[in-house]
Amino acid sequence: MMTCAAILLAATFTRPLERVTTMDPALAQSVYESRAVQLAYETVLAIDYVARPYQLVPGACELPEVSEDGLRYVFRVRSTELTAGEIVRSLERLRDPDLVSPNGWMLKSVDTIKALDDRTVEIRLTQKCHFFPWLMAMSQTGIRKTDGSGTGMYELSSWWKNHEMVFTRRKADADGGFDTIRYLVVDDASTKWLMFLKGELDFLAEVSRDNWDAIVDEKGNLDPKLVAQGIRMYSNSTLESIYIGINMRDPILGPNRKLRQALNAAFDYPRWEKFYSGRIVPSTGPVPPGIDGRLETPFAYSFNLEKARQLMVEAGYPNGIDPKTGRRLTLTLAIGRASQDTREAGELVAAFYDRIGIRLELSFHTWNAFLKAVDEGRVQLFNMGWVGDYPDAENFLQLFHSKNVSPGPNHANYVNPAYDREYDLAMGAATAEARNRHWWKCQEILREDCPWVFTHFNLANSLVRPRVGNYIPSCFPYGQECHFKVIDK
């Protein structure tokens, strides 16, 4: 007979997660915050958990009625716990000047948001926006009731900041979902792995480089010993674009395009791929493979050491030497955590740039301090990632529009009127074909200006223990635990 403690443990799903700094949907920025927010808050619309290609389904509201000109959206409230007024207030918080949400860019095409009655919301746009419904499925549209609480599947019952978050189910589930969700902050990758092996963690969203060889055999398949325990491994592509951002406001890097091109050409992707055990895809721009509108032509500044050295000469730093001082050019790379993996990755990047004479200093920060420094433009180079919020090239290309400079998502503070013009033309295009022509031009401009060092796109390799059912890999994993089922109670 199971004890009460054993039953409680069996109905609890535990996974590691990076630090969450806010549970306010309007302030959530990281993928980790988005995961937590969607457990506790319903979004206006939702992304189907099963369907591929991805498609939208009702959330707090039914799918919208859209006017013929694409400028008027009418949402009928579906949730019995929310009113149209609460939905309007929650969305308006995204552009509240007193709150200063970093997600205000989501409403840049919105004119008015009104409650027509208690069960109907009307949103009018200033210009047609083909992906607008997808924005309404993002975590940042999580609806807060008047008292600030949510109406999601779970509610936050305890939060020991920087250590643990516990969510308890608030909605009945006859299909056998987990009663409790625990997020644990575990910084050390080896500790995560040992906890997973001992059954203290039910899920690993990623496997560290150091532990990879212990997980797979020589063919890259899951080790038979793990298979015998019922452990499952899932490998899938993601919409996670990883890059080294270049602050265009920096007096050294901003005006010197040749120097930025050299940083790209010196980035040794074959060595980088080996460092990550082949679990990445090369990046030749910001738009991931598989997304309509991605530019597929070769990147002129892919790894080429000889070319990088010549670009350093053209940039005014032959062999990395600043002729004004006679000393090596020194740049600083800001990194948002100090784990073993990030330290080793940073040291490898420093080795790449040492080959062209640049001395790269690594500056490690806590995640909060890092985000603040990036938002305020107090960094020179910074290691960052962007996970697609919806499957559209625009979601990645808006990261470079001048309207979105920090504290918006354009953390590189890239400003180019020619780029803005092509982007705006794409947004107003009548067909996908016409839109893609402008997206391709945007990417051509970016590839020449190099406001990022384009490093890679992540591949996801998840490990799931046998007691967890109904796990489906997704590029949009926010709130996915709401769909999990308990197999071994």
Regions found by a protein language model. Give the residues of each.
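Structural transition elements
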Residues: D250-P255, P282-Y317, R337-E344
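Ligand/substrate-recognition segments at binding pockets and active sites
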Residues: R15, K161, P282, A315-G388
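Surface-exposed binding/hinge segments that line
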Residues: R76, P102-K145
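Detector for C-terminal structural segments
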Residues: L17, Y32, I242, N264-E296, ...
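Gly/Pro-rich hinge or "lid" segments in bacterial periplasmic/extracellular proteins
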Residues: A46-A51, L125-R182, S190, L305-E306, ...
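Aromatic- and charge-enriched surface segment that lines or borders ligand/interaction sites
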Residues: L63-L99, E122, K192-K198, L253-P255
